[in-house]
Amino acid sequence: MYQINISPDKKFCDISPALYGIFFEDINRAGDGGLYAEMLINRAFDDGVIPEDCTYNADSKTITSATGWVSSFNCAETEGIYGWTASGGAHMALTDKDTLNNARKRALKIRFNGGMIVNCGFEGISVKAGCKYRFYMFAKSEKCAQISVSLMSEYGEVYAQQLLTVEGDYAKYECMLESMSDNNKAVLSLSSLSTDLVTIGFSSLFPTDTFMKRENGLRRDLAEKLIALKPAFLRFPGGCIVEGFSKETAHRFEDTIGAVWERRPHWLLWGYNTTNGLGYHEFLQFCEDAGIDAMYVFNCGMTCQARCPDYFDDELVEEMYNDAVHAILYATAPADTEWGAKRALNGHVEPFRCLKYLEIGNENYGEEYNRRYKYFYDKLKSEFPQYTYIATDHTEKNGLLTEMVDDHFYSDPIFFATNNGMYNSLGQNDVQIYVGEYAATIGCKRGNLYAALGEAAFLTGVERNQSKVKMTSYAPLFNNSAYTAWEPDLIVFNNHASYSIPSYYMLKMFAENRGSYVCMHNVITDYDKRYEHGVFRYTFNGEAIIAGSTDENSRSFSADVDIINGRLTVSFWSTCAEGEDQNHYDFVCEDGKCTVIHYNGWSRETICEGHCDLVGSFAKVEIDTNGDEFEIRINGSQIHKATLKAVPHISAVCTVDEATNELVIKIINITERDITVKIISDIPMTDKALITTLTAESMQAGNSFDTPKAVAPVANEVQLEDGKINIGARSVNVVRIALR
């Protein structure tokens, strides 16, 4: 039986206007060559510079930080000039002796000798006939050198060409290039007959058709896809890049404002360099242009704790604190103040009004974070009380003042579907929640319908709890298809096209159909058990237990362990996968505490907690599993017995749209069969409904460059018979029914 009972005139909670937002992090080359419309790769020539305090291994093409974190590094300057090639007798080399300014680490010295140098762009430069592109460079030459700037095919066919005359010390030289042809694999070439030395300190190529026609702007099609989601806010700039994996790679606001050629570069822990062209100013400008709120995330004095962390000393913590303060003042101070004047100099005289949220760190936790969080929160709240401050851990559990906590979940779709009641038990006086990063990842790397179904089921629970869960944002946002570091991502692009995964369309449906308030309702549904499988893995104080044993079907475990004097960890139903694909349940026994935790993807869920007071040291530990049940005994006494949460066939949430006098019902069917749902309302409904449905023939169905809308919403008007509506298999649905 499937039924939704609704009381439209009984308000359960108000909607949170900020519930659906977006989160940008420069991952998968989402910045330069992506949302930031720059078309030249390595435009500042410093991509191959090894970050300070890191060592380079040429054999493995990796760098290692001072604390031991190893990261890919495939563009070392000792092995070529990344993105640039020379031909026809031209010779080029990098130098650190004659750079454009103190922010630039390298310049490019060239003797053309009748030849050319070429930039390949981001897997090619995409040009269109009749479209214009603005090129500029800072260059110098002791003698007059005439340089041809061309857009051309990789085979030498010229589409646009202009001549620049370079002479004397560094100066900015620019020109407009109008292409005569279409080509997604074009290149930019600089050529000259000169044999004299020419030095280039910075270069850039931008389309003139950017979002809002801004000169240092955003790629229009990608920005418009973001706005189509109707976001309430934008979280920026990360993500793990805020922390970095070393002191030098930690994010600093002051490196991201001013003329782009005067901004320090930033080696990102995702394995590439950014020139910070898409910086703090551009972030605020986009929020203002889009009419949305801004959330700024800043480093609180520590690097990424998942990457051999480094905890900054008090002096550097204070430096990071001042960096955060300066960012706030840059956005909001009058133009006649120090930081307001810097903003005005960059073209925005009036303060930005969009800054609303400040997040202290990213994915930080533990004692080191608590100490830094308190320092930042206490001082900032005193000086800037008007903002909402967000913690990255549940600092309220340690007695710290906490306004909002940023929860992150990367798991499989079933984890999301079974946890749609995760926030039901939160009290009205508990801390507010921001689900700042979430995505179904396991089995969904390319982005498919299955992921959207699980996420949608989870979000119905979030919508029911908007008095406690105030904001959400999917992550990551963008993926350049040629530079993938993380999947799935909401929007996939190359240098000329883009498409959105099914989760994008699900979120668009949800954001466009908010209603005015959540009304009282209850959902009646059948369930499927969550059957787990996998092997046992067990350790004591970090080392394997020799005496432990499991049966041949991996359904039971037994071991004699000195659990009073150590830490016992038994993983069961373990698939043995690591990282984001992991799925296992850990029984952890230490200091009399016995806890079962489910690790799924990058998420963890406490299944049960308890205590065990033992007489003597050694104990017999036994674990039995059976499909969706487990029992744990110590010395024959039952410590835990639990059944996993079942998977609801349908998940739903109901709001009332007061402007249209309609019920807005979001219904997710995660099964492989059609389901008839009866809708019963305390207030009479009309017998017609508008139903918008996201579905496909397969759970694995997704979109691509060739079929960008293979999985996209379709709207239909349907007739209700006795309040019954058909909800198709594998579908996300928004049903709107007028009240009489």
Task: Describe the residue ranges of each PLM region.
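Short carbohydrate-recognition loop motifs
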Residues: 95-114, 531-544, 593-598
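Aromatic- and acidic-residue-enriched carbohydrate-binding clefts of CAZyme catalytic domains
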Residues: 22, 53-56, 60-107, 242-280, ...
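An acidic-aromatic substrate-binding cleft motif
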Residues: 5-40, 46, 180-182, 191-273, ...
